[in-house]
Amino acid sequence: MTEIGREPKKKSKGNRAIRMNLFFLAVFVLFTALIFKLGVVQIVEGEQHEEDAEKSNAKTAYYPAPRGKMYDRNQKVAVDNQSVPEIVYVSTSSTKTEDKIKTAKRLASFIHIDTEFLKERDLRDYWIAAHPKKAAALLKESESNLKGDQAYKLQIERVPDQELKAIQQDDEEMETAAIYTRFSSGNAYEPQIVKAMNPNKSNSNGKNGALLDEKKNSSQRPKNDLTYDEISIVSEHLEELPGIDIVNDWTRKYPYDKTLYSVFGGVTTPDQGLLSDRKDFYLTRGYANNDRVGKSYLEYQYEEYLNSHKEKVEYVEDNKGNVVSQKTIDKGSRGYDLQLSFDMELQAKVEKIIEEEVRNSRARGNYMLDRAFAVMMDPNNGDILSMAGKKIDLKTNKIEDYAIGAFTTQYEMGSAVKGATVLAGYQDGIPHYKYYIDAPMLLGTNLIKKSYTNMGTINELTALQKSSNVYMFNVAMHIAGVTYKPHGSLPADQNDLLKMRNYYSQFGLGVKTGIDLPQESAGMQTTPKTVGGLILDLAIGQYDTYTPLQMAQYISVIANGGYRVQPRIVTSIHKPGKKDQLGKAIEHRKPKVLNKINNSESDLKQVQTGMKLVTSSGTAKNTFTEDVSGKTGTAETFYYGTNRNWWGKKTYNLTFVGYYPSKKPKVAFSVVVPSVDDDDKINKIIAKRAIHAYAELEKKHSKK
């Protein structure tokens, strides 16, 4: 029995040994796998994990790259960039206030800096930063537990006035305060411009956009503009100036000087930074507070394309926030380039013509004349070939670019609108060759409406040729459903006025043209309590006001056979190309027809015939050497310009609209000259010279 009872114990010991062996085997396998994994991590993946660890402590700074360029239709650079040296400051996560103060003081010993921008609040901030113990003493013991912002607010309020005066009386400390303020304008790893070179002060001729000289130039103002001497000395002491660097930034350069300057628009400075009304819009798209953005016209309109892809520099910090390495991870690139519809050579010639003729007209006694405009566009695709405007300062006699006035200011255009009136009459049922008697019209007891002379029996052709007002009055009355009776009333109402305006709007008169620029005016339309005879004034361009650009669009409709084409300035957008060459196009802006007028081909041919009569034997005969068709305009008005002493004085706006050549026109144009005598010919002279300049350039380009 005893022998039989011992057998189970032997089996139990054997099972235990097997389990122990299996356990040790499992432990061995696990340790082997762990060792293998550690080997993989350390040897195979070591570099990757090290990079990942560095990335967790990496910070990125963005440095500016140039904006996109603008080219004219002939691929000539119209708006360029040039490199500008500047001193920048970049703080890190571990940068303390005392570090900024120390660096600011050291930098102030090497450079001069303008202090005019400093405000009292800046000086208070600087004093607290420069005197931390004194600033702490400004708080009462009971205020020691206040939160940082609350405590700082009290300190700012309590900075002693004598301390501020002491700073203001010390030029060196004022410059230190200015530098410290620049340092503190942004966040860590956000480069702050301390001082930049002014390219416009670096050459003797003073032309805007000339390249920086490669040698020192004494004409630079030392406080406002960085000098080569300052660059040299700062470069020698960079090790003593943590966070300071000298980099190349950019500024706009204009190869054609002030030509079209206002239309190109402006760009903010780093001090101005983002536009306040669009700040959130820009910040959500990765902009920094001190980034420069387009602030007007083309620069503003095409900001999303012109804005550059910034250079990225990566800074790696240790656990204490100290920078242990830095490297450029993206060199950045300039923004997209724009190809414009402008012919810069033509533009320059037309601007010169306007400037010369404005001065000539003023010399003839037109002392109230202070501006003139000429717009030239391709009537077939809407390309603006030239948009020139000049405005003279009546006090200094200096003439400035005012091209933006061609689409932002409006004027009574006079008889130049009569082509639209005739076509409106056709739409309203007036037949071709409808005859009226051109004689004074007597309305009511004492209102006389007439042409400048009695023309007898006329139709639409002679009405355009001789510029009959009476024919147009009859068109307006037909539209209003009124039959003329001597000394009778003219019961036209708001509906009649609206009906005429709707006819005109088909041509672009009284509505925006759709040009790709901000702030376009639609002209001015009022709503009178009583319409009556005002509808007659509307028919001859003496009531509603229009822009010079609207007039160019209107005459383009007649020139191209009845299509209102949207004016365009940017024709295509391109990737940056080689030096002064367009790169690959990323977008082509196709011509856009906004509407077709409700007139037949024969209607348009009839008006085209009338406009040819104007230049061959009418009010513009012997004006052009080229085959031009068009219409003159004279609007009686009153002066309400910049000189209030002349307000209310009677004057005239002289205008001209036309196209060239008369058959298959390539260019349509408008000329608008406000505030001149009615017998002056400045409108015709500008039109003649502008078309001649176009024709000469056309010959020149055809030979290439």
Curated annotation (Swiss-Prot):
Q: What happens when the gene is disrupted?
A: No visible phenotype during vegetative growth, sporulation or spore germination. No change in antibiotic resistance. Double pbpA-pbpH mutants cannot be made, suggesting the 2 proteins have redundant, essential roles in vegetative growth. Depletion of PbpH in the pbpA deletion leads to cell growth arrest after 3 generations; cells swell, round-up, many lyse and division septa are very irregular. Germinated spore are spherical and eventually lyse.
Write down the membrane topology: Single-pass membrane protein
Basic and acidic residues: compositionally biased ranges: 212-223
Q: What is its EC number?
A: 3.4.16.4
User: Which pathway does the UniProt entry assign to this protein?
Assistant: Cell wall biogenesis; peptidoglycan biosynthesis
Which superkingdom heads the taxonomic lineage of this protein's source?
Answer: Bacteria
Q: Which residues form the active site?
A: 415 (acyl-ester intermediate)
The residue stretches assigned to a coiled coil in this entry are none
Keyword Disulfide bond among record annotations = no
**InterPro entries (UniProt xref):** Bact_Transpept/Beta-Lactamase, Beta-lactam/transpept-like, PBP_dimer, PBP_dimer_sf, PCN-bd_Tpept
* Transmembrane annotation, as ranges: 23-43
CC annotations in GO: plasma membrane
Q: Which GO terms describe its biological process?
A: cell wall organization; peptidoglycan biosynthetic process; proteolysis; regulation of cell shape; response to antibiotic
Sequence similarity? Belongs to the transpeptidase family.
The job of this chain, per UniProt, is described as: Involved in the polymerization of peptidoglycan. Plays a redundant role with PBP-2A (pbpA) in determining the rod shape of the cell during vegetative growth and spore outgrowth.
Official protein name in the record:
Penicillin-binding protein H
Q: What's the source species for this entry? A: Bacillus subtilis (strain 168)
Query: Which gene is transcribed and translated to give this protein?
Result: pbpH
